[in-house]
Amino acid sequence: MRITNKFGLPGTLMRMIERDTYTKGSAKISVTGMISSPRVAALRRKHFTSMESDVSDHLWRLMGQAISMIAERGASNQYITEQRLFGECLGWILSGALDLQEIIDGDTVDILDYKFTSTWAVMSDKPEWENQLNCYAWLVRNQ
């Protein structure tokens, strides 16, 4: 994918996008990939090298990554931050990176997923957010 800078944002932002360290590890698919449209995923795979995206389209994701890095400061025996979990289902390896797991007791875990977004995003239901948390819960239960 080619990254553009149509609005002349600082070059450091472009490098942050280009040097993204995200990986789904050895998984066939990530939780976010699994809950996304299969048609969009297929088209993205097919046309990835000819796709174009602007730096400005990635700013929310950068802010989310920054929040995740800061959240790691809160890690303790009770709080597990930024852990990537893996599970197998029907021969597929699935992975998900959980922002925060709060260990309530030996058998109970609260899962939190931070969202850095605009107010418009919370004005309607986001079933994909619920689906994401349900997949994370499945990964936690199957460890």
What are these regions (language model features)?
Residues 1-111, 118-131:
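Metal-dependent nuclease catalytic cores that hydrolyze phosphodiester bonds in DNA/RNA
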Residues 129-141:
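An active-site-proximal "capping" alpha-helix that borders the catalytic cofactor pocket
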